[in-house]
Protein backbone atom coordinates (compact mmCIF):
# COMPACT_ATOMS: atom_id res chain seq x y z
CA UNK A 1 0.00 0.00 0.00
CA UNK A 2 1.33 3.45 -0.97
CA UNK A 3 0.36 6.39 1.24
CA UNK A 4 -1.88 8.99 -0.36
CA UNK A 5 -0.83 12.64 -0.22
CA UNK A 6 -3.48 13.23 2.44
CA UNK A 7 -2.09 10.40 4.56
CA UNK A 8 1.45 11.76 4.25
CA UNK A 9 0.13 15.06 5.63
CA UNK A 10 -1.74 13.29 8.45
CA UNK A 11 1.41 11.37 9.43
CA UNK A 12 3.59 14.48 9.79
CA UNK A 13 5.05 14.87 13.26
CA UNK A 14 4.19 11.25 14.06
CA UNK A 15 5.78 8.63 11.77
CA UNK A 16 6.95 11.09 9.09
CA UNK A 17 9.15 14.20 9.32
CA UNK A 18 9.73 16.46 6.28
CA UNK A 19 11.41 19.80 7.07
CA UNK A 20 10.68 22.29 5.63
CA UNK A 21 7.17 21.18 4.56
CA UNK A 22 4.92 23.04 2.04
CA UNK A 23 1.36 21.93 1.24
CA UNK A 24 1.85 22.93 -2.41
CA UNK A 25 4.34 20.11 -2.83
CA UNK A 26 1.83 17.36 -2.00
CA UNK A 27 0.84 15.05 -4.90
CA UNK A 28 -1.95 12.42 -5.07
CA UNK A 29 0.37 9.74 -3.66
CA UNK A 30 3.74 11.37 -2.96
CA UNK A 31 5.46 14.63 -1.94
CA UNK A 32 7.92 16.71 -4.06
CA UNK A 33 11.39 17.50 -2.65
CA UNK A 34 13.68 20.36 -3.74
CA UNK A 35 17.33 20.42 -4.91
CA UNK A 36 19.90 22.05 -2.57
CA UNK A 37 22.55 24.25 -4.21
CA UNK A 38 25.54 22.07 -3.23
CA UNK A 39 26.98 19.39 -5.55
CA UNK A 40 29.92 16.99 -5.18
CA UNK A 41 31.83 15.56 -8.15
CA UNK A 42 34.47 12.85 -8.02
CA UNK A 43 38.03 13.94 -8.71
CA UNK A 44 39.48 10.64 -10.00
CA UNK A 45 40.45 9.31 -13.43
CA UNK A 46 39.09 5.89 -12.47
CA UNK A 47 36.89 5.33 -9.42
CA UNK A 48 37.58 2.32 -7.20
CA UNK A 49 35.08 0.44 -5.02
CA UNK A 50 37.82 -0.30 -2.46
CA UNK A 51 38.97 3.29 -1.99
CA UNK A 52 37.59 6.53 -0.51
CA UNK A 53 37.45 8.38 -3.88
CA UNK A 54 38.43 12.09 -3.84
CA UNK A 55 35.65 14.64 -4.42
CA UNK A 56 35.31 18.38 -5.20
CA UNK A 57 32.49 20.65 -4.10
CA UNK A 58 30.47 22.86 -6.51
CA UNK A 59 27.83 25.46 -5.71
CA UNK A 60 24.95 25.97 -8.16
CA UNK A 61 24.89 29.73 -8.80
CA UNK A 62 21.72 31.83 -9.25
CA UNK A 63 21.92 31.53 -13.06
CA UNK A 64 22.12 27.73 -12.83
CA UNK A 65 24.86 25.30 -13.89
CA UNK A 66 25.27 23.16 -17.03
CA UNK A 67 25.64 19.44 -16.31
CA UNK A 68 27.77 17.34 -18.70
CA UNK A 69 26.62 13.86 -19.77
CA UNK A 70 29.60 11.71 -18.82
CA UNK A 71 29.83 13.01 -15.24
CA UNK A 72 28.15 11.95 -11.97
CA UNK A 73 26.95 14.80 -9.76
CA UNK A 74 26.08 14.04 -6.14
CA UNK A 75 23.43 16.48 -4.89
CA UNK A 76 21.00 16.44 -2.01
CA UNK A 77 17.47 17.29 -1.04
CA UNK A 78 16.83 20.62 0.60
CA UNK A 79 14.53 18.80 2.99
CA UNK A 80 15.53 16.74 6.01
CA UNK A 81 13.33 13.64 6.48
CA UNK A 82 12.71 10.97 9.09
CA UNK A 83 10.50 7.94 8.56
CA UNK A 84 9.22 5.30 10.96
CA UNK A 85 6.58 2.61 10.31
CA UNK A 86 6.86 3.07 6.49
CA UNK A 87 9.50 2.37 3.84
CA UNK A 88 10.46 5.72 2.22
CA UNK A 89 11.34 5.67 -1.50
CA UNK A 90 12.64 8.35 -3.85
CA UNK A 91 11.85 8.67 -7.56
CA UNK A 92 12.33 11.45 -10.07
CA UNK A 93 9.46 13.56 -11.43
CA UNK A 94 8.30 12.97 -15.00
CA UNK A 95 9.03 16.65 -15.85
CA UNK A 96 12.68 16.00 -14.87
CA UNK A 97 12.90 12.57 -16.55
CA UNK A 98 11.51 14.04 -19.80
CA UNK A 99 14.67 16.24 -19.85
CA UNK A 100 16.87 13.13 -19.49
CA UNK A 101 18.00 13.86 -15.92
CA UNK A 102 18.40 10.86 -13.60
CA UNK A 103 18.10 11.66 -9.88
CA UNK A 104 19.29 8.29 -8.61
CA UNK A 105 21.36 5.44 -10.03
CA UNK A 106 19.15 2.39 -9.30
CA UNK A 107 19.18 3.50 -5.65
CA UNK A 108 15.76 5.02 -4.90
CA UNK A 109 14.98 2.39 -2.28
CA UNK A 110 15.04 3.56 1.37
CA UNK A 111 14.90 1.96 4.81
CA UNK A 112 12.32 2.27 7.56
CA UNK A 113 14.01 4.37 10.29
CA UNK A 114 16.29 6.41 8.00
CA UNK A 115 16.96 9.98 9.23
CA UNK A 116 18.74 12.65 7.18
CA UNK A 117 18.95 14.42 3.83
CA UNK A 118 18.76 12.26 0.70
CA UNK A 119 21.93 12.22 -1.40
CA UNK A 120 20.90 12.36 -5.08
CA UNK A 121 22.93 10.66 -7.83
CA UNK A 122 22.40 13.05 -10.77
CA UNK A 123 23.34 12.05 -14.31
CA UNK A 124 22.11 13.57 -17.59
CA UNK A 125 21.73 12.08 -21.07
CA UNK A 126 22.27 15.44 -22.86
CA UNK A 127 23.92 18.65 -21.56
CA UNK A 128 21.40 20.63 -19.48
CA UNK A 129 21.28 23.79 -17.36
CA UNK A 130 19.75 23.05 -13.94
CA UNK A 131 18.80 25.33 -11.04
CA UNK A 132 18.85 24.88 -7.27
CA UNK A 133 15.48 25.04 -5.51
CA UNK A 134 13.70 23.18 -8.35
CA UNK A 135 11.33 20.39 -7.25
CA UNK A 136 13.63 17.64 -8.50
CA UNK A 137 12.16 14.42 -7.08
CA UNK A 138 9.36 12.94 -5.01
CA UNK A 139 9.28 10.87 -1.85
CA UNK A 140 6.62 8.18 -1.38
CA UNK A 141 5.92 5.62 1.30
CA UNK A 142 5.07 1.91 1.42
CA UNK A 143 3.71 0.14 4.49
CA UNK A 144 6.05 -2.47 5.93
CA UNK A 145 4.88 -5.94 6.94
CA UNK A 146 5.49 -7.42 10.38
CA UNK A 147 7.92 -6.23 13.03
CA UNK A 148 11.19 -4.77 11.89
CA UNK A 149 14.53 -3.40 13.03
CA UNK A 150 14.97 0.24 12.15
CA UNK A 151 17.81 1.42 9.87
CA UNK A 152 20.83 2.19 11.99
CA UNK A 153 23.83 1.73 9.65
CA UNK A 154 26.83 3.81 10.62
CA UNK A 155 27.27 5.00 7.04
CA UNK A 156 24.50 7.41 6.13
CA UNK A 157 22.24 7.70 9.21
CA UNK A 158 21.81 11.24 10.68
CA UNK A 159 23.85 12.73 7.84
CA UNK A 160 24.31 16.52 7.68
CA UNK A 161 24.61 16.82 3.90
CA UNK A 162 25.82 15.13 0.68
CA UNK A 163 27.73 11.90 1.32
CA UNK A 164 29.88 10.24 -1.34
CA UNK A 165 29.98 6.42 -1.34
CA UNK A 166 31.35 4.75 1.80
CA UNK A 167 31.37 1.34 0.06
CA UNK A 168 35.11 0.95 0.76
CA UNK A 169 34.19 0.37 4.42
CA UNK A 170 32.53 -2.92 3.38
CA UNK A 171 35.95 -4.18 2.31
CA UNK A 172 37.69 -3.24 5.59
CA UNK A 173 35.80 -5.42 8.10
CA UNK B 1 0.02 -4.85 -2.44
CA UNK B 2 0.65 -5.29 -6.18
CA UNK B 3 -2.27 -6.42 -8.34
CA UNK B 4 -1.94 -9.85 -9.92
CA UNK B 5 -2.46 -10.19 -13.67
CA UNK B 6 -5.85 -11.77 -12.98
CA UNK B 7 -6.88 -8.82 -10.82
CA UNK B 8 -5.79 -6.35 -13.51
CA UNK B 9 -8.10 -8.19 -15.91
CA UNK B 10 -10.96 -8.20 -13.38
CA UNK B 11 -10.58 -4.43 -12.83
CA UNK B 12 -10.85 -3.54 -16.53
CA UNK B 13 -13.75 -1.20 -17.26
CA UNK B 14 -14.04 -0.36 -13.58
CA UNK B 15 -10.93 1.15 -11.93
CA UNK B 16 -8.55 0.35 -14.80
CA UNK B 17 -8.71 1.22 -18.52
CA UNK B 18 -6.13 -0.15 -21.01
CA UNK B 19 -7.02 0.38 -24.68
CA UNK B 20 -6.37 -1.62 -26.76
CA UNK B 21 -6.19 -4.65 -24.41
CA UNK B 22 -4.86 -8.14 -25.35
CA UNK B 23 -4.96 -11.10 -22.94
CA UNK B 24 -1.59 -12.32 -24.29
CA UNK B 25 0.09 -9.28 -22.72
CA UNK B 26 -0.91 -10.21 -19.16
CA UNK B 27 1.93 -11.25 -16.82
CA UNK B 28 1.78 -12.78 -13.31
CA UNK B 29 1.68 -9.32 -11.70
CA UNK B 30 1.70 -6.73 -14.52
CA UNK B 31 0.64 -6.06 -18.13
CA UNK B 32 2.94 -5.42 -21.13
CA UNK B 33 2.52 -2.20 -23.16
CA UNK B 34 3.66 -1.61 -26.77
CA UNK B 35 5.83 1.11 -28.35
CA UNK B 36 4.09 3.57 -30.73
CA UNK B 37 5.98 4.52 -33.91
CA UNK B 38 6.37 8.22 -33.05
CA UNK B 39 9.49 9.63 -31.32
CA UNK B 40 10.47 13.16 -30.29
CA UNK B 41 14.10 14.29 -29.93
CA UNK B 42 15.27 17.60 -28.51
CA UNK B 43 16.76 20.06 -30.97
CA UNK B 44 19.04 22.05 -28.63
CA UNK B 45 22.79 22.18 -27.99
CA UNK B 46 22.15 22.55 -24.27
CA UNK B 47 18.76 21.90 -22.68
CA UNK B 48 17.47 24.37 -20.07
CA UNK B 49 15.04 23.62 -17.23
CA UNK B 50 13.60 27.14 -17.49
CA UNK B 51 12.80 27.03 -21.21
CA UNK B 52 10.39 25.18 -23.53
CA UNK B 53 13.14 23.23 -25.34
CA UNK B 54 12.69 22.76 -29.14
CA UNK B 55 11.92 19.24 -30.40
CA UNK B 56 11.81 17.34 -33.72
CA UNK B 57 9.53 14.45 -34.60
CA UNK B 58 10.76 11.08 -35.95
CA UNK B 59 8.72 8.13 -37.23
CA UNK B 60 10.06 4.61 -36.68
CA UNK B 61 9.91 2.99 -40.15
CA UNK B 62 8.98 -0.66 -40.81
CA UNK B 63 12.68 -1.71 -40.84
CA UNK B 64 13.24 -0.10 -37.44
CA UNK B 65 15.51 2.78 -36.38
CA UNK B 66 18.99 2.81 -34.78
CA UNK B 67 19.15 4.71 -31.47
CA UNK B 68 22.42 6.46 -30.54
CA UNK B 69 23.75 6.34 -26.97
CA UNK B 70 24.15 10.01 -26.16
CA UNK B 71 20.62 11.00 -27.23
CA UNK B 72 17.29 11.07 -25.38
CA UNK B 73 14.31 9.77 -27.37
CA UNK B 74 10.81 10.56 -26.09
CA UNK B 75 8.39 7.82 -27.20
CA UNK B 76 4.98 6.73 -26.02
CA UNK B 77 2.88 3.70 -25.32
CA UNK B 78 0.50 2.53 -28.01
CA UNK B 79 -2.07 2.02 -25.27
CA UNK B 80 -4.22 4.69 -23.60
CA UNK B 81 -4.71 4.06 -19.87
CA UNK B 82 -6.81 5.37 -17.01
CA UNK B 83 -6.39 4.37 -13.37
CA UNK B 84 -8.51 5.04 -10.32
CA UNK B 85 -8.17 3.49 -6.86
CA UNK B 86 -4.61 2.25 -7.61
CA UNK B 87 -1.21 3.85 -8.18
CA UNK B 88 -0.04 2.91 -11.72
CA UNK B 89 3.69 2.39 -12.25
CA UNK B 90 5.78 1.73 -15.36
CA UNK B 91 8.93 -0.35 -15.57
CA UNK B 92 10.89 -1.82 -18.47
CA UNK B 93 10.91 -5.52 -19.31
CA UNK B 94 14.00 -7.57 -18.54
CA UNK B 95 14.32 -8.54 -22.24
CA UNK B 96 14.60 -4.81 -23.04
CA UNK B 97 16.91 -3.98 -20.11
CA UNK B 98 19.24 -6.84 -21.10
CA UNK B 99 19.82 -4.90 -24.37
CA UNK B 100 20.73 -1.76 -22.40
CA UNK B 101 17.59 0.22 -23.30
CA UNK B 102 16.12 2.44 -20.56
CA UNK B 103 12.39 3.19 -20.96
CA UNK B 104 12.21 5.87 -18.28
CA UNK B 105 14.71 8.18 -16.59
CA UNK B 106 13.97 7.62 -12.87
CA UNK B 107 10.33 8.51 -13.67
CA UNK B 108 8.32 5.26 -13.66
CA UNK B 109 6.14 6.45 -10.76
CA UNK B 110 2.52 7.34 -11.64
CA UNK B 111 -0.43 9.00 -9.92
CA UNK B 112 -3.83 7.62 -9.00
CA UNK B 113 -6.28 9.29 -11.43
CA UNK B 114 -3.86 9.73 -14.34
CA UNK B 115 -5.51 9.45 -17.82
CA UNK B 116 -3.58 9.33 -21.10
CA UNK B 117 -0.71 7.72 -22.98
CA UNK B 118 2.57 7.23 -21.13
CA UNK B 119 5.50 9.27 -22.48
CA UNK B 120 8.60 7.04 -22.42
CA UNK B 121 12.11 8.45 -21.85
CA UNK B 122 14.23 6.11 -24.00
CA UNK B 123 18.01 6.03 -23.70
CA UNK B 124 20.42 3.28 -24.78
CA UNK B 125 23.85 2.28 -23.47
CA UNK B 126 25.03 0.93 -26.86
CA UNK B 127 23.71 1.68 -30.40
CA UNK B 128 20.62 -0.49 -31.07
CA UNK B 129 17.99 -1.00 -33.78
CA UNK B 130 14.49 -0.86 -32.27
CA UNK B 131 11.06 -1.51 -33.81
CA UNK B 132 7.62 0.01 -33.19
CA UNK B 133 4.94 -2.35 -31.85
CA UNK B 134 7.44 -4.21 -29.63
CA UNK B 135 6.23 -4.88 -26.07
CA UNK B 136 8.62 -2.36 -24.54
CA UNK B 137 7.47 -1.97 -20.92
CA UNK B 138 4.98 -3.15 -18.32
CA UNK B 139 2.41 -1.37 -16.18
CA UNK B 140 1.70 -2.54 -12.65
CA UNK B 141 -0.52 -1.31 -9.86
CA UNK B 142 -0.17 -0.68 -6.14
CA UNK B 143 -3.11 -0.16 -3.78
CA UNK B 144 -3.25 3.32 -2.27
CA UNK B 145 -3.88 3.90 1.46
CA UNK B 146 -6.65 6.15 2.77
CA UNK B 147 -8.63 8.75 0.85
CA UNK B 148 -6.86 10.65 -1.87
CA UNK B 149 -7.21 13.46 -4.39
CA UNK B 150 -6.94 12.24 -7.95
CA UNK B 151 -4.19 13.49 -10.31
CA UNK B 152 -5.43 16.56 -12.10
CA UNK B 153 -2.27 18.50 -13.03
CA UNK B 154 -2.69 20.72 -16.06
CA UNK B 155 0.57 19.41 -17.53
CA UNK B 156 0.13 15.83 -18.68
CA UNK B 157 -3.46 14.83 -17.86
CA UNK B 158 -5.67 13.69 -20.82
CA UNK B 159 -2.68 13.93 -23.19
CA UNK B 160 -3.12 12.91 -26.84
CA UNK B 161 0.46 11.78 -27.46
CA UNK B 162 4.14 12.31 -26.59
CA UNK B 163 4.74 15.34 -24.38
CA UNK B 164 8.17 16.88 -23.86
CA UNK B 165 8.94 18.33 -20.42
CA UNK B 166 6.74 21.22 -19.25
CA UNK B 167 9.02 21.85 -16.25
CA UNK B 168 9.54 25.47 -17.36
CA UNK B 169 5.95 26.15 -16.24
CA UNK B 170 7.07 25.54 -12.63
CA UNK B 171 9.33 28.58 -12.92
CA UNK B 172 6.58 30.87 -14.28
CA UNK B 173 4.09 30.87 -11.37
CA UNK C 1 3.25 -3.97 1.85
CA UNK C 2 7.02 -4.58 1.77
CA UNK C 3 8.38 -7.46 3.84
CA UNK C 4 10.61 -6.49 6.74
CA UNK C 5 14.04 -8.12 7.04
CA UNK C 6 12.70 -10.26 9.87
CA UNK C 7 9.80 -11.47 7.71
CA UNK C 8 12.16 -12.35 4.88
CA UNK C 9 14.08 -14.54 7.33
CA UNK C 10 10.87 -16.12 8.65
CA UNK C 11 9.75 -16.94 5.09
CA UNK C 12 12.93 -18.78 4.14
CA UNK C 13 12.32 -22.38 3.13
CA UNK C 14 8.61 -21.66 2.73
CA UNK C 15 7.72 -18.93 0.19
CA UNK C 16 11.27 -17.58 -0.22
CA UNK C 17 14.52 -19.32 -1.17
CA UNK C 18 17.87 -17.46 -1.10
CA UNK C 19 20.94 -19.71 -1.47
CA UNK C 20 23.46 -19.15 -0.02
CA UNK C 21 21.91 -17.10 2.82
CA UNK C 22 23.85 -15.02 5.41
CA UNK C 23 22.14 -13.19 8.30
CA UNK C 24 24.64 -10.31 7.97
CA UNK C 25 23.09 -9.41 4.63
CA UNK C 26 19.63 -8.70 6.09
CA UNK C 27 18.48 -5.04 6.04
CA UNK C 28 15.45 -3.41 7.72
CA UNK C 29 13.25 -4.18 4.68
CA UNK C 30 15.40 -6.07 2.15
CA UNK C 31 18.34 -8.48 1.73
CA UNK C 32 21.70 -7.75 0.04
CA UNK C 33 22.86 -9.99 -2.85
CA UNK C 34 26.45 -10.45 -4.07
CA UNK C 35 28.05 -10.12 -7.52
CA UNK C 36 29.28 -13.32 -9.20
CA UNK C 37 32.65 -13.13 -11.04
CA UNK C 38 31.23 -13.82 -14.53
CA UNK C 39 30.28 -11.01 -16.95
CA UNK C 40 28.91 -11.07 -20.51
CA UNK C 41 29.44 -8.20 -22.98
CA UNK C 42 27.82 -7.87 -26.38
CA UNK C 43 30.09 -8.32 -29.37
CA UNK C 44 28.19 -6.22 -31.96
CA UNK C 45 28.70 -2.80 -33.55
CA UNK C 46 24.94 -2.19 -33.40
CA UNK C 47 22.57 -4.35 -31.35
CA UNK C 48 19.28 -5.44 -32.92
CA UNK C 49 16.05 -6.28 -31.11
CA UNK C 50 15.19 -8.89 -33.76
CA UNK C 51 18.46 -10.84 -33.57
CA UNK C 52 20.27 -13.08 -31.06
CA UNK C 53 23.16 -10.63 -30.49
CA UNK C 54 26.65 -12.18 -30.11
CA UNK C 55 28.28 -12.01 -26.65
CA UNK C 56 31.72 -12.58 -25.08
CA UNK C 57 32.41 -13.84 -21.57
CA UNK C 58 34.68 -12.03 -19.08
CA UNK C 59 35.86 -13.21 -15.65
CA UNK C 60 36.43 -10.58 -12.92
CA UNK C 61 39.93 -11.34 -11.59
CA UNK C 62 40.99 -11.07 -7.93
CA UNK C 63 42.32 -7.53 -8.45
CA UNK C 64 38.99 -6.41 -9.93
CA UNK C 65 38.12 -5.10 -13.42
CA UNK C 66 37.65 -1.55 -14.74
CA UNK C 67 34.24 -0.93 -16.33
CA UNK C 68 34.01 1.59 -19.19
CA UNK C 69 31.08 4.04 -19.41
CA UNK C 70 29.70 3.35 -22.88
CA UNK C 71 29.48 -0.42 -22.42
CA UNK C 72 26.75 -2.71 -21.02
CA UNK C 73 27.98 -5.52 -18.77
CA UNK C 74 25.60 -8.38 -18.00
CA UNK C 75 26.44 -9.89 -14.61
CA UNK C 76 24.52 -12.04 -12.19
CA UNK C 77 23.82 -12.54 -8.51
CA UNK C 78 25.87 -15.13 -6.65
CA UNK C 79 22.65 -16.21 -4.99
CA UNK C 80 19.95 -18.43 -6.46
CA UNK C 81 16.43 -17.34 -5.46
CA UNK C 82 12.87 -18.64 -5.64
CA UNK C 83 9.80 -16.65 -4.67
CA UNK C 84 6.18 -17.66 -4.24
CA UNK C 85 3.33 -15.61 -2.76
CA UNK C 86 5.33 -12.33 -3.09
CA UNK C 87 6.58 -10.15 -5.95
CA UNK C 88 10.41 -10.05 -5.78
CA UNK C 89 12.11 -6.82 -6.83
CA UNK C 90 15.77 -5.87 -7.27
CA UNK C 91 17.31 -2.46 -6.64
CA UNK C 92 20.88 -1.24 -6.27
CA UNK C 93 22.39 -0.19 -2.96
CA UNK C 94 22.97 3.50 -2.28
CA UNK C 95 26.71 2.84 -1.73
CA UNK C 96 26.83 1.47 -5.31
CA UNK C 97 24.60 4.19 -6.81
CA UNK C 98 26.77 6.88 -5.20
CA UNK C 99 29.63 5.56 -7.39
CA UNK C 100 27.46 5.90 -10.51
CA UNK C 101 26.99 2.16 -11.10
CA UNK C 102 23.57 1.05 -12.39
CA UNK C 103 22.68 -2.58 -11.59
CA UNK C 104 19.62 -2.78 -13.80
CA UNK C 105 18.33 -0.86 -16.81
CA UNK C 106 14.74 -0.01 -15.78
CA UNK C 107 14.24 -3.74 -15.19
CA UNK C 108 14.25 -4.32 -11.41
CA UNK C 109 10.67 -5.61 -11.44
CA UNK C 110 10.25 -9.38 -10.86
CA UNK C 111 7.44 -11.93 -11.09
CA UNK C 112 5.84 -14.07 -8.40
CA UNK C 113 7.05 -17.63 -9.10
CA UNK C 114 10.41 -16.70 -10.64
CA UNK C 115 13.21 -19.24 -9.96
CA UNK C 116 16.88 -18.67 -10.81
CA UNK C 117 19.82 -16.27 -10.62
CA UNK C 118 19.15 -12.60 -11.38
CA UNK C 119 20.89 -11.26 -14.46
CA UNK C 120 22.20 -7.75 -13.69
CA UNK C 121 22.43 -5.03 -16.34
CA UNK C 122 25.51 -3.10 -15.19
CA UNK C 123 26.34 0.31 -16.63
CA UNK C 124 28.63 3.00 -15.15
CA UNK C 125 28.61 6.79 -15.52
CA UNK C 126 32.40 7.12 -14.96
CA UNK C 127 35.16 4.47 -15.32
CA UNK C 128 35.29 2.34 -12.14
CA UNK C 129 37.12 -0.70 -10.80
CA UNK C 130 34.68 -3.26 -9.43
CA UNK C 131 35.21 -6.54 -7.56
CA UNK C 132 33.31 -9.85 -7.53
CA UNK C 133 31.74 -10.86 -4.22
CA UNK C 134 30.76 -7.27 -3.39
CA UNK C 135 27.18 -6.82 -2.06
CA UNK C 136 25.99 -5.13 -5.25
CA UNK C 137 22.19 -4.99 -4.92
CA UNK C 138 19.25 -5.82 -2.68
CA UNK C 139 16.15 -7.94 -3.13
CA UNK C 140 12.84 -6.91 -1.55
CA UNK C 141 9.35 -8.30 -1.62
CA UNK C 142 5.83 -6.92 -2.12
CA UNK C 143 2.66 -8.84 -1.27
CA UNK C 144 0.53 -9.67 -4.29
CA UNK C 145 -3.26 -9.13 -4.35
CA UNK C 146 -5.74 -11.87 -5.24
CA UNK C 147 -5.04 -15.19 -6.90
CA UNK C 148 -2.34 -15.29 -9.54
CA UNK C 149 -0.62 -17.47 -12.11
CA UNK C 150 3.03 -18.03 -11.31
CA UNK C 151 5.81 -16.92 -13.69
CA UNK C 152 6.52 -19.74 -16.11
CA UNK C 153 7.97 -18.01 -19.20
CA UNK C 154 10.26 -20.20 -21.26
CA UNK C 155 12.86 -17.44 -21.45
CA UNK C 156 14.48 -16.94 -18.08
CA UNK C 157 12.82 -19.42 -15.68
CA UNK C 158 15.17 -21.96 -13.95
CA UNK C 159 18.22 -20.27 -15.52
CA UNK C 160 21.70 -21.56 -14.63
CA UNK C 161 23.56 -18.27 -15.05
CA UNK C 162 23.75 -14.96 -16.97
CA UNK C 163 21.28 -14.76 -19.85
CA UNK C 164 21.52 -12.14 -22.60
CA UNK C 165 18.26 -10.80 -24.01
CA UNK C 166 15.95 -13.34 -25.69
CA UNK C 167 13.70 -10.54 -27.01
CA UNK C 168 14.19 -11.75 -30.60
CA UNK C 169 11.94 -14.73 -29.72
CA UNK C 170 9.03 -12.28 -29.37
CA UNK C 171 9.38 -11.51 -33.09
CA UNK C 172 9.39 -15.18 -34.15
CA UNK C 173 5.94 -16.33 -32.98
UniProtKB/Swiss-Prot annotation, chains A, B, C:
Catalytic activity: dCTP + 2 H2O = dUMP + NH4(+) + diphosphate
Active site: 121 (proton donor/acceptor)
Residues reported to bind dCTP: 93-98, 111, 119-121, 138, 151
Enzyme class per UniProt: hydrolase
Site entry (Important for bifunctional activity), positions: 108-109
Entry keyword set: Hydrolase, Nucleotide metabolism, Nucleotide-binding
Pfam families: DCD (PF22769)
Keyword Endoplasmic reticulum recorded: no
InterPro entries with a match to the protein in the record: dCTP_deaminase, dUTPase-like_sf, dUTPase_trimeric
UniProt similarity note: Belongs to the dCTP deaminase family.
Function statement: Bifunctional enzyme that catalyzes both the deamination of dCTP to dUTP and the hydrolysis of dUTP to dUMP without releasing the toxic dUTP intermediate.
Subunit structure: Homotrimer.
Protein name: dCTP deaminase, dUMP-forming
Biological classification of the source: Bacteria, Bacillati, Bacillota, Clostridia, Eubacteriales
Amino acid sequence: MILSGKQIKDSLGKDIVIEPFNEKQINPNSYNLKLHNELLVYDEEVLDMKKPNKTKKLIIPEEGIVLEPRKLYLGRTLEYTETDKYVPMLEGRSSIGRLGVFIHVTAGFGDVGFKGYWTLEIFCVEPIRIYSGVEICQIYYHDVGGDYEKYSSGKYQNNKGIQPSLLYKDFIN
